[in-house]
Amino acid sequence: MEYKRFKTRQIKVGNVLIGGDAPISVQSMLFTKTRDIEGSLEQINRLYFAGANIVRLACLDMADARALKEIKAKSPLPLIVDIHFNHNLAVYCAEFIDGVRINPGNIGSKENIKEVVKACKERGIPIRIGVNHGSIEKQFSDKFGYGVDAMLESAMYNIKLLEDLDFFDIKISMKTSDAQKTIEAYERLRPLCDYPFHLGVTEAGTKFHSTVKSSIALGNLLLKGIGDTMRVSMTGELEEEIRVARAILQDSGVQKSGVNIISCPTCGRIQSDLLSAIKIVEEKTKHIKEPLNISVMGCVVNALGEAKGADVAIAFGKNQGLVIRHGEVVAKLKESELVDRFLAEVEDEVKSRVVKE
């Protein structure tokens, strides 16, 4: 299946392009109190090394806003301020931040939005219209309830509001906590505008539930060419958010980066400690950014076939096994020596590609 992405306008968050032909970026949000400068920077650095492109922070009051100014000066990543209720905080933060997210359901009057737009326009920073099914404006929830119809009305109303103020550096999110409703909301809005979309399932839950919901919703949308930046929302799991997001991009075939591990589910034919081997391989290869297919198989039934499609592979047997590279056997070793040799071949494969580039 050919992947064809919906062509959107391009905006810029710090040094990260979003929309157009830009790669789909991955975002996260800190769970520190923003006024905790040291703690916030520690989490930003963790996200940076995990492979995040953009970070969002909450701003509840002026103490947060002033701290955010200091955090921004030391951050290795572009920062977006997340504003609810108090538009004055957005106006203040626009002086130094890379982007603003507003919730149309609680930002207040048109005059409030006008002030935010003026500040962002002067700095040349974008605004995300963050529509959330749990906080729709009363004028739309009264008429449509808290479903997708109300979300669409809210999105189009607020898009027009910004456009009427001659502001077009816009991205949009349509988040619900339900995978099907999230898909429907983004699909129905996509033909109505050409602004870039920020994909996400809100309040998705802990690691297990978030991974399932986000994979269904975001994977579905990405395969339809919808989405320009994304976040996998996950309770208290910073690095895992990035890891799952990158895996969704890779396994949907949208973006190739990092290691794709093919491993068998195990059965009675296995005569080796495959589970331990896979855990070691996952841990030792998670730093690799180069797109790489590797195969870790527990017996010969499918191992050789999978190895033909892998860059580097292990085929375990009884007390011994094969290391295979691009379909060619490079070593036959005792089981205890297999993983180390396999990892050495993986690193050599990465180095050989870097040299060619």
Curated annotation (Swiss-Prot):
It catalyses: (2E)-4-hydroxy-3-methylbut-2-enyl diphosphate + oxidized [flavodoxin] + H2O + 2 H(+) = 2-C-methyl-D-erythritol 2,4-cyclic diphosphate + reduced [flavodoxin]. Its cofactor is [4Fe-4S] cluster. It comes from the Bacteria. [4Fe-4S] cluster binds at C264, C267, C299, E306. Its EC number is 1.17.7.3. Binds 1 [4Fe-4S] cluster. It is an enzyme of class 1 (oxidoreductase). GO terms for molecular function: 4 iron, 4 sulfur cluster binding; 4-hydroxy-3-methylbut-2-en-1-yl diphosphate synthase activity (ferredoxin); 4-hydroxy-3-methylbut-2-enyl-diphosphate synthase activity (flavodoxin); iron ion binding. Belongs to the IspG family. PANTHER family: 4-HYDROXY-3-METHYLBUT-2-EN-1-YL DIPHOSPHATE SYNTHASE, 4-HYDROXY-3-METHYLBUT-2-EN-1-YL DIPHOSPHATE SYNTHASE (FERREDOXIN), CHLOROPLASTIC. Converts 2C-methyl-D-erythritol 2,4-cyclodiphosphate (ME-2,4cPP) into 1-hydroxy-2-methyl-2-(E)-butenyl 4-diphosphate. NCBIfam families: ispG_gcpE (TIGR00612), PRK00366.1 (NF001540). This is 4-hydroxy-3-methylbut-2-en-1-yl diphosphate synthase (flavodoxin). It comes from Campylobacter jejuni subsp. jejuni serotype O:2 (strain ATCC 700819 / NCTC 11168). The lineage of its organism: Bacteria, Pseudomonadati, Campylobacterota, Epsilonproteobacteria, Campylobacterales.
